[in-house]
Amino acid sequence: MSTRKAQHGARQDTEYGARQGTEQGARRSAQRGALGRYGESLAARRLTESGMTVLERNWRGGRTGEIDIVARDGDALVVCEVKTRRAGLFEHPMAAITPAKAERLRGLAERWVQEHGGAPPGGVRIDLVGILLPDRGAPVVEHVRGVA
């Protein structure tokens, strides 16, 4: 990669170097997207196996964000956040629900309910499905109900 000297002797990437970095970033982004879709498929399967009905996946609430899975559990509506991680690289997926994230999910759930005819008799619950992908072996799927 070619570089040139900037003021104060620091190295600065030229156009080729910046483009190369962008291509690497795009590849990583595509890999993260594929990982997320795989995790969401595993989560939807787990929810279905536990008796829930998946109503929607990847519902977008305008610019405020996205609900990974909207499901029905009896007479309750479930807004489900899915976090998928490779083992050892990042924090555990269950650490993903911060107070700010919980508040955003509550707002998205409220918007979904408004757009779909009101709250069901069983209310609305926010769940988390955390998926840990080990280097070898089967994925570990954890479902925690009522996280926020």
Curated annotation (Swiss-Prot):
Top-level taxonomic group: Bacteria
InterPro entries tied to this protein: Restrct_endonuc-II-like, tRNA_endonuc-like_dom_sf, UPF0102_YraN-like
Pfam families according to UniProt: UPF0102
Positions of the UniProt region annotated as Disordered: 1-35
Gene3D superfamilies in the record: 3.40.1350.10
One of the record's GO molecular function terms: nucleic acid binding
CDD domains named among the record's database cross-references: PoNe_Nuclease
The family this protein is said to belong to: Belongs to the UPF0102 family.
Protein name: UPF0102 protein SAV_2633/SAV2633
Organism (species): Streptomyces avermitilis (strain ATCC 31267 / DSM 46492 / JCM 5070 / NBRC 14893 / NCIMB 12804 / NRRL 8165 / MA-4680)
